[in-house]
A protein has these predicted regions:
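Conserved Walker A/P-loop ATP-binding site and its immediately adjacent core
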Residues: 1, 53, 75, 164-169
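Conserved helicase ATPase core of P-loop NTP-dependent helicases/translocases
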Residues: 2-15, 159, 168-171, 184-222
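Conserved helix/coil segment N-terminal to the catalytic DExD/H
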Residues: 8-39, 50-55, 220
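Structural recognition of the conserved hydrophobic beta-strand(s) that form the central parallel beta-sheet
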Residues: 19-22, 64-71, 213-216
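A short beta-strand element within the Helicase C-terminal
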Residues: 35-41, 215-216, 223-238, 247
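Post-DEXD/H (motif II) to motif III coupling segment of the RecA-like Helicase ATP-binding lobe
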Residues: 38-39, 44-111
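Conserved SF2 helicase motif VI
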Residues: 57, 73-74, 240-250
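Conserved interdomain hinge at the start of the Helicase C-terminal
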Residues: 124-163, 167-181
Length: 250
């Protein structure tokens, strides 16, 4: 009656006063469209440092009430100032430790696995730039087979996160799938091209499973996704982003 959804798969109905939308769906709208809003609520507010989201927020010139929610801010002063300019002063309402103690977040255990490479490989990689080194790491056959074996030997539902779809995500999915007993264990692949409804279906199925594997991109399964029945997360691709790591763990 009062709420409309404005993203892929839903028809536009401007007769309803409350709009729930992705920023991608709103990015094509004219500035005038946003003048009618009195209130803006931005979930995953740490993402609002992007130019497109700032453009949308700045177009909401009549929005007196602005609320941004996030569990992760990075350590950059500039990042914090940008968000305060859009939403107002930051208020910390709780901590990760408090949420873990209240059983609202998982009491996680972090295991850092260090893979050792040959001297010749180290000498070769030393000459590469950042992107070339990343490409070398994610295409390393032994490393990918190690991730496959690690994934298959975990007990419970396991999420494997990757950064590059073609050169890493699909490779891992095929490696795991080729040697998996599909009768006893479900395997899913999720990336930017996966429909929103299909992602939700996969999430729902996993919550009712106890030994499923999801191979997913950081972009689709590191922010805004909540799987209550998840036992293991494997970071298959290297990342320096504090927010990405914390969001994935959350």
């Amino acid at each position: 009656k009062f709420v409309q959804r404005k993203y892929y798969g839903y028809e536009i109905d401007d007769s309803k006063p409350v709009v729930i939308s992705t920023w991608q769906s709103l990015a094509t709208f004219d500035k005038k469209y946003f003048e009618k809003f009195d209130c803006v609520v931005g979930d995953e507010a740490h993402l609002y440092k992007s130019k497109e989201l700032q453009k949308i927020m700045n177009a909401c010139i009549n929005a007196k009430y602005r609320i941004g929610t996030t569990g992760t801010l990075d350590d950059s002063k500039v990042h914090k100032l940008v968000l305060e300019g859009l939403f107002g002063r930051v208020h910390n309402v709780t901590t990760t430790r408090e949420l873990i103690d209240k059983k609202q977040l998982a009491d996680l255990k972090i295991q850092c696995l260090i893979l050792k490479y040959s001297q010749d490989e180290c000498k070769h990689v030393k000459k590469l730039n950042y992107q070339e080194e990343m490409d070398y790491i994610v295409s390393h056959e032994k490393r990918n087979k190690f991730i496959r074996n690690l994934t298959k030997t975990r007990t419970g539902n396991t999420l494997v996160l990757f950064q590059y779809v073609e050169k890493h995500g699909k490779v891992l999915y095929d490696l795991i799938g080729d040697t998996l007993d599909h009768q006893t264990r479900k395997l899913f692949f999720v990336y930017g091209g996966t429909e929103t409804k299909d992602r939700e279906t996969i999430r729902s199925i996993t919550e009712n499973e106890n030994n499923a594997i999801i191979v997913a991109s950081y972009g689709t399964f590191s922010t805004g996704i909540n799987i209550r029945n998840l036992h293991n997360v494997i970071f298959a691709s290297p990342t320096k982003s504090k927010i990405r790591i914390l969001q994935s763990l959350g």
